[in-house]
């Protein structure tokens, strides 16, 4: 292997039941060589072995979970060692998968599996203890994905979208609409509240529609306060996004929330995605728009 060639290293971790198996399978499909439960202290030696092999292997994914909970300090030491040895050679990212407690409990009940830390078979006790153990690791993560509302195929799509770029230093802006009544997305870097804007929900013929439809978006965008908000947020993001990119972040998740995630937030997420489409790789999603249709 050419010693100057960069090696992408993704460390997959997170809450038990949050989707690490799907993440591994998705990265394997992208050409990553995946290793499950490698002791963190052996990571530098393992990478040396990979580099000295005759085969070209420049994309690695390593799964670290509670089976190796005593090794988390060694994980940080190994990452720091690799960073110090050659900043230009290793592109290391920690991918942390998370989900709300209630969803994790539901998944354990559906699969009839026991949480690795659960006492007396009570998954919620294990989940709470696991969160405490993983707090520092989550704080070091460059990528956090909330899988609460994601089906396996949706998680796969999200991982492929985040890791399939030809240029791994490319910068992606994820614009996400959501409803505050369903909770703030935990993987958002920035959150903006647009509940102060006039609400199409109170217009009878607009209530069943969404911000993806012209009538609703026209209604939301016609107000003076909407245009003032757009102008101010465009100015703020025009300043902030280049700073995030310069800092070395590979992606930023921007959450725009209204009450139900159906009208105002959807309209504005679509608007800002179009505004910045010529400057950045944009991805827009509407977390709660289907929930809104059901109500």
Curated annotation (Swiss-Prot):
ATP binds at residues 14-21. Signal peptide: none annotated. The keyword Hydrolase does not apply. Gene3D superfamilies: P-loop containing nucleotide triphosphate hydrolases. It comes from the Bacteria. One of its GO terms (molecular function) is ATP binding. Keywords: ATP-binding, GTP-binding, Nucleotide-binding. GTP binds at residues 65-68. Belongs to the RapZ-like family. Displays ATPase and GTPase activities. This is Nucleotide-binding protein BH3569. It comes from Halalkalibacterium halodurans (strain ATCC BAA-125 / DSM 18197 / FERM 7344 / JCM 9153 / C-125) (Bacillus halodurans). The lineage of its organism: Bacteria, Bacillati, Bacillota, Bacilli, Bacillales.
């Amino acid at each position: 292997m050419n010693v100057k060639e960069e090696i992408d290293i993704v460390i997959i971790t997170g809450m038990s039941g949050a989707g690490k198996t799907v993440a591994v399978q998705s990265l394997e499909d992208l050409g990553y060589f995946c290793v499950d439960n490698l002791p963190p202290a052996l990571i530098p030696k393992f990478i040396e072995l990979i580099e000295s092999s005759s085969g070209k292997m420049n994309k690695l994914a390593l799964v670290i979970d509670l089976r190796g909970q005593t090794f988390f300090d060694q994980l940080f030491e190994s990452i720091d060692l690799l960073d110090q040895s050659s900043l230009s050679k290793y592109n290391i990212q920690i991918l942390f998968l998370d989900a709300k407690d209630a969803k994790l409990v539901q998944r354990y009940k559906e699969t009839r599996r026991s949480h690795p830390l659960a006492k007396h078979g009570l998954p919620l006790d294990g989940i709470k203890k696991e969160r405490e153990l993983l707090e520092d690791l989550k704080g070091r993560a460059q990528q956090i994905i909330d899988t609460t509302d994601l089906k396996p195929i949706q998680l796969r799509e999200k991982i492929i979208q985040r890791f399939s770029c030809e240029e791994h230093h490319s910068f992606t802006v994820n614009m996400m609409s959501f409803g505050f009544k369903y909770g703030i997305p935990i993987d958002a870097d920035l959150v903006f509240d647009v509940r102060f804007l006039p609400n199409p929900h109170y217009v009878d013929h607009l209530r069943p529609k969404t911000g993806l439809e012209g009538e609703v978006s026209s209604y939301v965008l016609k107000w003076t306060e909407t245009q003032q908000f757009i102008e101010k947020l465009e100015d703020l993001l025009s300043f902030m996004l280049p700073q995030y990119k310069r800092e070395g972040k590979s992606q930023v998740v921007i959450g725009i929330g209204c009450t139900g995630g159906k009208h105002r937030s959807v309209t504005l997420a679509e608007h800002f995605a179009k505004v910045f489409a010529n400057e950045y790789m944009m991805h827009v999603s509407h977390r709660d728009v289907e929930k809104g249709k059901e109500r």
